[in-house]
């Protein structure tokens, strides 16, 4: 998946799509039955006939759990690419983000339809996200030459609420543990989840400690540069994703399962 760190309004649909998919991932993780997870998976790639044809029996083996998550991770990326392909091709300030691969799964335990579905999604995913394609589009270099200073930045994504799927900030942190940042730069990036709309355009001074303290102690205060510091304008480095504010409509077909 992708997020845009420019803060430009014309690219906010990229971040809105990312936010919806993160909520979908939360719902997927909370499902207690494989049938519920399968319905969500099918809703992401409705034109992939191999996925649509899968049944509960294809996931009968307990050893295919890791494969299920990998299918879902690739499906989310493909859904966002389909949803925002024009913007993604134009945007020079995107960061690729993927759900981390499961530790292991046994492909031999999967049924033939499940292995075929995996091969189909992997082929489509590799077309857009493979090393050669990413290198060709310059995704791996974007964070390195687009950031104005060599320090950490924090991407603040306001938390979304959709019916009964509302999650607490603490719960969302567990989702972040399953995410990895995919880029070649050595510059560390963080994702901070919050439910507070007042942080949309927040660039607080360092002494505004109480603003950030309630969102966890692992944040990173940074100074933009020496000139800014000399003027007393020490600020937290923030990339604003304003498109994710507010509640998404429950009529969104992505969440009708």
From Swiss-Prot:
GO cellular component: cytoplasm; mitochondrion
Record-stated family: To yeast YKR015c.
Protein name: Uncharacterized protein YJL043W
